[in-house]
Amino acid sequence: MQVSLSSNFPALSPNDSSAPAPDGELLSALIEEAIAAYSPVPPQASADSVSMRQNLMQLLSWAHSLEQVAARTVERVQILGTGMRSVVVCVAYKPAAESAESLPTSIIVKRYRRKDSTVNAGGFGYLRERYGLEALNLQVPGLFPQLYGADPELRVLALEDVSAGTVEGEQYSVAHALLEGTEQQALDALNYYIEAYRPLAASGIMGEAVEEYRLNLARADRKAHFPGAIASPGLAERGLKKLYGVADEARSPEPDADSMDSSSAEHEDAPVLPAAVEELSFRFRRVLQPFFTKRPPVPEQFKLNRGKVYMLSSGDFSPQNVLIGSADGTQVRMVDAEGTCLHHRGFPFVEAMLGFPSSPEYPRYRVDRMKALPALYSALFEDAPLDEHLAEDLAVCTAVTVCALLELYSSSARSGLLPRIRREGAQLMRLLLEIAGSQDATLAEFADHLGALK
C-alpha cells in the first residue's frame, strides 16, 4: 500500500495509481548494470544475488507511480549502499516535459531489511526515518530531504536526492573535506557542520512537530517506553559492564533480602552489580532517557528544565551525513534520518571533540579543536556558561559515547582503535570537570578507570 504524503507536503499531488507499468526488460538491464558497477566495502553486502535483483525490481516498480516520478522512463540505477539495516539506491529518470519541469531528475529509494522495522521504534530504522523526516523538515525547513512516499508493507521510503545540486563529482560531504582537503578547507567544512546543527539546536523540543513525532512512534510501537529517545540505549550499558568486567546478567544489589519478590529471587544467584556500575548506569539512563521522553502525553513542565539542553536531530553525528551544496543553492544539507531522536545537545559536541570516533574513517578526520569547536559549543548551547551541571552532563555524554563504542568495536576489526578512544575520552571528561570546578567523584573515578589502559 503506497502512502500519499500530500497532507504533509501540500504542494504534492496524489499518487497516480493508474500509471502505465514500467518497461520490465529495461529495468532488468539497468539493474544488471548497477550490480556490475557496485563494489561493496565491508560491512556492505554483495548485491550480486537473486534476492537483491528481485528487491531492486520491486523498488523500481513501486517508485514508478510516485507523483514525483510521473511514470517517466528510468535512465540509470545506482546502488549506494547494501548495509545491515537498509538497501539504498539512486534512480535517475528521463527529464520531465516543460509542463512538469519541477519534477526531480532523480530520487533515492530505501528499503529496510528488518521485518519488524515498521513496528519497532527502539533502534535505527523505518519508523524513525519515515516520521523523523517530517518532524525535522518542520523544525528546520529544507535541511533534510523531502519525503516523497512510504510503503510500510514493503518497508520502503522514497526521498529527495539531495546530492543533485552539490558540487561536481561525488557528494561533497564535510567528511570528504576533513579527509582530503587543505587545512583551510577542513576548517571551512567544520563551519558547515556547525551551521547545520545551529538551527536544529535553536528549534529545541517544545514544538508540536516534536510531540507529533513521538506520538507517531508511540502509535506504531505499542511497546516503546521512551518513544523518540536516543536509539539503542542499551549499547552503552553493555559497554560499561564490559569495561568493568561485569557479566551482562549482573543484578542490582537488593536493599532488603526479606522484601525480595519471586521474580528477583529467581536471579539471586546472578552476580551483583558493583556500586560504581549501578550508579553510572543510572546516570547514563538519566541522560539517554530523561523523564519527558516517556510515552506521551507528558506534562509540559517536565520539559521546561532539562528539556532546555535537548534537541531533535537525525541522531547520527557523522560528518559524512552533512553535505556542502553548490554556491548558488542551499549551502548545507543533511542526510540519513534513520536514528531521529531527542538527545542531549552534548552528543554532537562530544563526537566532534573526540574526532568523530563513530564514523568510518576515524581517526583520519582533521578536526581543529582549538579553532572550530568553541563555535560548535556556542551553536549548540547558545553561549550558556559551562557550569557544573552542564559539564557533568557533557562528561556523561562522553562516557556514554565511549562505552557504546566499546560494545560495538570490541569484537570487530576496529578494536585496535579502542585504546585511543578510551584515552581521549578520559582526557575530555577530566577537562570538562576541571573547567567547571566539578567535585563529582563518580565521574572523576570513571575517567581514571577509563584511561587506565592495560
Residue ranges and their predicted role:
Residues 2-77:
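Juxta-kinase regulatory segment immediately upstream of eukaryotic protein kinase catalytic domains
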Residues 5, 259, 398-454:
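ATP/Mg2+ or Mg2+-diphosphate-binding catalytic cores
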Residues 26-50, 198-202, 210-301, 433-437:
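Active-site catalytic-loop/activation-segment of kinase and kinase-like phosphoryl-transfer enzymes
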Residues 72-99:
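ATP-binding glycine-rich phosphate-binding loop
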Residues 90-125:
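ATP-binding glycine-rich loop module of kinase domains
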Residues 131, 346-385, 397-416:
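Active-site activation/catalytic loop segments of kinase-like enzymes and analogous catalytic loops
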Residues 146-155:
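Short beta-strand micro-motifs within the conserved protein kinase catalytic domain, predominantly
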Residues 168-212, 291:
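Conserved kinase catalytic-core helix
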